[in-house]
Amino acid sequence: MIISASTDYRAAAQRRLPPFLFHYIDGGAYAEHTLKRNVSDLSDIALRQRVLRNMSDLSLETELFGETLAMPVALAPVGLTGMYARRGEVQAARAADSRGIPFTLSTVSVCPIEEVAPAIQRPMWFQLYVLRDRGFMRNALERAQAAGVTTLVFTVDMPVPGARYRDAHSGMSGPNASLRRIGQAITHPHWAWDVGLFGRPHDLGNISTYRGNPTGLEDYIGWLGSNFDPSISWKDLEWIREFWKGPMVIKGILDPDDARDAVKFGADGIVVSNHGGRQLDGVLSTARALPAIADAVQGDLKILADSGIRTGLDVVRMLALGADTVLLGRAFVYALAAQGEAGVANLLDLIAKEMRVAMTLTGARRIADIGRDSLVNLP
């Protein structure tokens, strides 16, 4: 299959992956309306073309939390990334490192912190949930600090797991799920050989290290359901703010009032996000929510955004709507599943190329030049 655009990787991933894994990353909550709108609302935003602007010294570089990024992009935390390629978190982290951007390790990664951090040169970020087991949370924070993690991404939009009906149909969950997954693996020999056989152990590395026993795919959904904490409030985050000395980013903000609360709390940044449409169907797309949030808190903290970003044009659109940096989730997992580390590196090259074209034709020589006046009409 020829890969010529950043969006080509989705089809390549679907061909390679067993259905339970493809639909787990590809799907969303309920009827998936928000999932679809994340993409469509962003693609509907019109950029303002400018010409004869002397764009010969264009640069994608930006600064974030004291780090220099080659472009305003980071890889988002994605659970079970290590099931999409052999030791997938390590491969994705290496690709991000080679392209000068941060990689964010998920709490529910296959590869543990101690395996991923030594594989790269630049410090990685780490994502954490609020869980009933506060001992695990403290243990994870201590291990992250010991591994040299600089930035903590704290996900707050998952006090309960979303209703992801596609998972039950695909075999990730539901009746006879284990047998269905085995059958799917048999019919996808490339994945079965690369990941199923040589990508072991298939457990949740960060959790298994803490518990002292394997926590595999069979335990994943049950562990999530029993450990997410619906009683969470801003007060529950205070000890984490005191404990964590580096930048702390609150992920899962969709409302300006919550963004203002994050400022009061002392967060260094927020991620405007609806969890990729995987939590509550029917909420605003990130593209629709971002402008009002930027108006409310821009300048008080750093604004990151995810959900619906598939191309370099999408990155530029999000920056114009008010983001300082974006997170790529599904897009990099598709590339990882299709071509491993090389696929993620190539995806980032394609996105950088698409950004350069968009910036050249909108008259933005620097990332700071991208703003509301880069758009024809706001949504």
Swiss-Prot record:
It holds the Pfam family FMN_dh. The active site is at 275 (proton acceptor). It comes from the Bacteria. It is an enzyme of class 1 (oxidoreductase). Its cofactor is FMN. GO terms for molecular function: FMN binding; L-lactate dehydrogenase activity. It catalyses: (S)-lactate + A = pyruvate + AH2. Its main location: membrane. Substrate binds at residues 24, 129, 164, 278. InterPro entries: Aldolase_TIM, Alpha-hydoxy_acid_DH_FMN, FMN-dep_DH, FMN_HAD, FMN_hydac_DH_AS, LldD. It is found in: Cell inner membrane. FMN binds at residues 106, 127, 155, 251, 306-330. It is a peripheral membrane protein. GO terms for biological process: aerobic respiration; lactate metabolic process. Keywords: Cell inner membrane, Cell membrane, Flavoprotein, FMN, Membrane, Oxidoreductase. GO terms for cellular component: plasma membrane. Belongs to the FMN-dependent alpha-hydroxy acid dehydrogenase family. NCBIfam families: L_lactate_LldD, PRK11197.1. PANTHER family: L-LACTATE DEHYDROGENASE (PTHR10578:SF85), S -2-HYDROXY-ACID OXIDASE-RELATED (PTHR10578). This is L-lactate dehydrogenase. The gene is lldD.
